[in-house]
């Protein structure tokens, strides 16, 4: 076996953290359950993973699942991560804090591209990672063909650590290229070591030499040995494999079947020797001592819990934390986490992920410092942007107050959700990473808080502007005994270029309108522009106050404000208005084979393609720029993901307003008037 010098030595008493990542249905949860079952942490499969009603209903993970196990005297905690892009905001704070990520994939070359978003994020964060090709008992093609399909999606070379052995057309075991040993799968028990079959000796030698060539690219001494036909020592080979994976220079590849337990023990042994200690993750995050929060959740009677990884020193219940803003709080309970089960503990060792109670200010991605000074992490996640939104209306109006509090908790738990109040549309909007993500939040809202919701489409912020310039006079006169009301104004209103907004100019001379009442005229004009002929705010207009009349007794600020409003309302009727719709600039990311379908979908939504080219540093992907009406974006993400195997994404920013013509303009105006 290996010498101590070839191991990633475990810090005494510390716990190493593994993330299981990869696309939906690759078998991440099955692998976690296999790890727990093989190590005796679970009596049977299904005890820990995906226990929430929402996950069970969907048949895949929708949130982080945490569980721990012991293997050969070492402690590990596993973070089982959702695979769908709709739920991947859960990973933003978690991934930077783990020691190693196991990327779970299927043995299907056609699905290789599904790994690319995960691999790119791990590479960006600098998190060491290995691949586990799951479901190899179902594989029919060659491992080499699969590796060739996977190679373009990884920036780091993929280094096969094993080659399969076959019984007919089924994988029956593997040869470990580093150990140079052969193992045969045995259902329900550990694999059995056997001699390397004679007909595979040449294939094993070639595969091992290729592995050595790959790691020699980063070790001149090993390269010299290969060039001079010197056989490197096993310890030297393992030392290179450990170092190069930990530095992100290579990504080792293992395979097996989580469902049958094949290859799981061998994976565990490799992880035991090669997973870096917690100190590396702490250094990557620049944390000296404290608890880094992966996620928060409200857990019934337990209140708010912060799920956090311990760095620097063991964490005791009741420990005092210094928050990022300098506030001090004490842990109000410390719990070990095994799936949905929480168990109160007195202390959590370095590297462990535990649940901490009653730190209400804690948020994902923050550090609860125990060093006495505030700390903040250096590997902050990139902020998510909403891709789909609905307007919310409580089915029972008595639930409005409860709804507000419940939504705040959901958004706090899930960094991919956004809650906004659109004052103009008078709508409460819940936005997320896709329709499924938002629907999940609404299900949780009902299950946890008993609040039922009706949803509407968010209103599009249309605008109007004048069709032509016009001069308009308006007089406000009212006599009802005593002081009356009188104001007379003449204005010129004309359209301005897009994006100019509202401009007010006074050309009053000689006191036709007293100076102190000119601002009232402007206020009145603004009042009138709040609602145009089609029911939308009017913009890109210049209004010039040309003349007016006043009365020494009956004129007032309110009278001139009313006259200003009447003048612009009559001006709009005389000039007519045109309807403007908001146009967004989209940047869409798509795998290259789907790019033509994506551009067609955008065009069908009245989009204007501005450019198409390769996505930087993403081999086999395209970057598409387009203008798209905001009203056409509502369900775009669903269509986009349907065209791209669930991988497509976009960024949208307001760009300009553009005239809406014909039947569409008529329909929008009619709906606005009907809803008035």
Residue ranges and their predicted role:
Residues 2-676:
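Structural and coupling elements of P-loop NTPases
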């Amino acid at each position: 076996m290996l010498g101590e010098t070839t191991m990633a030595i475990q810090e005494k008493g510390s716990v190493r953290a593994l993330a299981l990542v990869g696309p939906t249905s690759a078998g991440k949860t099955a692998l976690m359950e296999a790890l727990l079952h093989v190590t005796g942490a679970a009596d049977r499969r299904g005890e820990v993973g995906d226990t929430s009603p929402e996950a069970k209903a969907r048949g895949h993970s929708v949130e982080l699942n945490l569980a721990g196990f012991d293997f050969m005297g070492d402690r590990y905690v596993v973070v089982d991560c959702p695979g769908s892009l709709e739920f991947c905001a859960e990973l933003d704070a978690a991934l930077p804090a783990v020691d190693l990520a196991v990327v779970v994939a299927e043995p299907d070359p056609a699905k290789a591209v599904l790994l690319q978003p995960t691999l790119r994020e791990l590479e960006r964060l600098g998190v060491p990672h290995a691949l586990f090709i799951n479901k190899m008992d179902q594989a029919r093609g060659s491992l080499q063909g699969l590796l060739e399909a996977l190679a373009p999606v990884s920036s780091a070379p993929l280094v096969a650590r094993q080659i399969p052995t076959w019984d007919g057309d089924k994988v029956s075991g593997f040869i470990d290229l580093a150990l140079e040993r052969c193992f045969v799968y045995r259902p329900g028990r550990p694999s059995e070591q056997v001699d390397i079959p004679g007909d595979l000796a040449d294939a094993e030698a070639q595969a091992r030499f290729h592995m050595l060539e790959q790691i020699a690219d980063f070790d001149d001494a090993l390269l010299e040995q290969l060039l001079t036909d010197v056989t490197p020592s096993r310890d030297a080979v393992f030392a290179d494999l450990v170092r190069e994976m930990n530095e992100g220079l290579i990504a080792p590849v293992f395979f097996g079947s989580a469902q049958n337990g094949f290859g799981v023990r061998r994976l565990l042994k490799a992880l035991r020797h090669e997973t870096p200690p917690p100190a590396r993750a702490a250094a990557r995050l620049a944390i000296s001592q404290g608890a880094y929060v992966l996620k928060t959740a409200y857990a019934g009677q337990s209140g708010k819990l912060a799920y956090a990884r311990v760095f620097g020193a063991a964490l005791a219940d009741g420990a005092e934390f210094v928050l990022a803003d300098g506030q001090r709080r004490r842990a109000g309970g410390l719990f070990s986490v095994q799936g949905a089960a929480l168990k109160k503990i007195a202390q959590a060792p370095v590297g462990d992920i535990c649940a901490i109670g009653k730190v209400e200010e804690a948020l994902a991605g923050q550090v609860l410092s125990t060093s006495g000074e505030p700390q903040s992490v250096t590997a902050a996640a990139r902020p998510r942007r909403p891709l789909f939104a609905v307007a919310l209306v409580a089915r029972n109006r008595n639930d409005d107050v409860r709804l507000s509090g419940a939504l705040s908790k959901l958004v706090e738990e899930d960094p991919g959700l956004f809650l906004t109040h659109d004052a103009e549309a008078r709508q409460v909007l819940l936005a997320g990473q896709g329709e499924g993500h938002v629907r999940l939040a609404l299900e949780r809202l009902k299950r946890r808080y008993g609040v039922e919701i009706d949803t509407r489409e968010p209103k599009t912020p249309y605008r109007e502007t004048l069709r032509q310039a016009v001069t308009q006079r308006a007089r406000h006169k009212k006599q009802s005994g005593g002081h009356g009301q009188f104001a007379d104004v003449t204005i010129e209103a004309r359209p301005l270029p897009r994006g100019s907004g509202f401009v007010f100019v006074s050309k009053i001379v000689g006191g036709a309108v007293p100076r102190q009442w000119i601002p009232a005229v402007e206020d009145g004009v603004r009042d009138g522009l709040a609602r145009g002929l089609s029911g939308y705010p009017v913009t890109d207009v210049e209004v010039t106050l040309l003349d007016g009349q006043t009365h020494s007794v009956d004129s007032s600020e309110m009278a001139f404000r009313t006259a200003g409003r009447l003048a612009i309302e009559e001006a709009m009727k005389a000039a007519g208005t045109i309807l403007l719709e908001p146009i967004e600039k989209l940047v869409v990311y798509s795998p290259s084979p789907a790019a033509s379908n994506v551009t067609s979908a955008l065009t069908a939504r009245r989009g204007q393609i501005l450019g198409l080219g390769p996505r930087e540093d993403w081999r086999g992907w395209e970057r598409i720029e387009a203008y798209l009406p905001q009203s056409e974006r509502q369900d775009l993400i669903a269509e986009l993901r349907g065209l791209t195997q669930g991988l497509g994404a976009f960024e949208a920013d307001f760009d300009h307003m553009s005239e809406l013509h014909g039947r569409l303009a008529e329909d929008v105006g009619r709906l606005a008037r009907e809803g008035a």
